[in-house]
Amino acid sequence: MSSSVPNSDRKIVTGPAGYILEDVPHFSDDFPDHPTYPNPLQDNAAYSVVKQYFVDEDDTVPQKIVVHPDSPRGTHFRRAGPRQRVYFESDDVLACIVTCGGLCPGLNTVIREIVCGLSYMYGVKRILGIDGGYRGFYARNTIHLDLKTVNDIHRSGGTILGTSRGGHNTTKIVDSIQDRGINQVYIIGGDGSQKGAAAIFEEIRKRKLKVAVAGIPKTIDNDIPIIDRSFGFDTAVEEAQRAINAAHVEATSFENGIGLVKLMGRYSGFIAMHATLASRDVDCCLIPESPFFLEGSGGLFEFIDKRLKESGHMVIVIAEGAGQDLLSESMKESTTLKDASGNKLLQDIGLWISQRIKDHFAKKMTLTLKYIDPTYMIRAVPSNASDNVCCTLLAQSAVHGVMAGYNGFTVGLVNGRHTYIPFNRITEKQNKVVITDRMWARLLSSTNQPSFMKQADKIHSNQLVGEPGTMKW
């Protein structure tokens, strides 16, 4: 690494052959004389057999791993993990954990593993849980967290800390952090919550407080960029199979039966796409990224008619954000409303399209349509085995980063390696399905559905290029 280049508060390090490190802030940036201490892990018997357990300071992870011989080395992120020196003495730490936004499988596992990581690995004894999301900071609601408190919470869905949307008041939150003497803040939440975490970090930095802020990204839709996937996603795809299986049973039990399942996916159709591929029983998958139309040649109604004549039944999976442009003008008026987190309130596309299908085929054939919306069932369940491992590693990586003095970062899996990512990279855009990518082609091949694209849409889609860092298989 050769030089550090200021870029509107971004910490950019450049090196030979086009190497770029998008680094995260560190305590040494603001407090160059801050003392450091030997990492307690070096005396931990559990890690005594691990060779090279501590991460080298120069270890980085590339954002893009598929390259050509003459490609520049490209963007990298700092590799997560424990360092040989830490910036906090265990007895001086007062940590807090907060969960924000909607529910997601794995929240309790992340809480548990932050507590266990701080306690077992670093000997931290004072850990607070902020009750009820961001507003819990200035409502003075806290829960004392220790190993006994969190022992079996991973077996339950939801979050023992409670959550809420909105309620972010940066000044009041940082006042509370300062008044309580908190010096480590762990924020578990989606893109909106990570923006809030970034604002908290900037205010803390402005006040020159020796407080570390780390984010653990939470989004069941998997719409956070850069990272391979977010925790809870695998569980959501697995749980969605129950609804799809039920829809398939209903559809095959009636003449011209249609099972319609609405899954989560406000702007990104990853759950719908992966649940469809996992099921193999779905005939049509509709997502926000791929426009469709109902009537005319190549439209949805024509495909439904064709499939019912061929098979006598059909299963459709639709993401909640798909087809919003097709809703009637009277329904569109209310879509300008937003929830407390600033998300646009969507109309129920599942109910609307169910009625449109029934109306269209009413005079053509006897048709039975069953509509299933498992949204809250899916997000309220405990995380599965895969997500439990994911949550554990994310939580431990966040703890290692904070103890090592890193600050103002989100932890995430990039190309199979855990990394520390600047807040701005996580919040600048959303991760979406690239419909010109091979994964969407695999889905179309699996369902044998048409693309539902009109000629103008096809021309536009051919101009799209997938972002490096989106989900790759």
From Swiss-Prot:
Gene behind the chain: PFK1
Pathway connected to this protein: Carbohydrate degradation; glycolysis; D-glyceraldehyde 3-phosphate and glycerone phosphate from D-glucose: step 3/4
Organism: Arabidopsis thaliana (Mouse-ear cress)
Binding site for substrate: 219-221, 264-266, 320, 376-379
Main EC class the enzyme belongs to: transferase
Entry-linked Pfam families: PFK
Regulation of protein activity: Allosterically activated by AMP.
Protein name (database record): ATP-dependent 6-phosphofructokinase 1
Residue(s) carrying Phosphoserine: 71
Gene Ontology BP, a term: fructose 6-phosphate metabolic process
Organs and tissues of expression: Expressed in roots, leaves, stems and flowers.
Main location (coarse class): cytoplasm
Positions with a binding annotation for ATP: 102, 165-166, 190-193
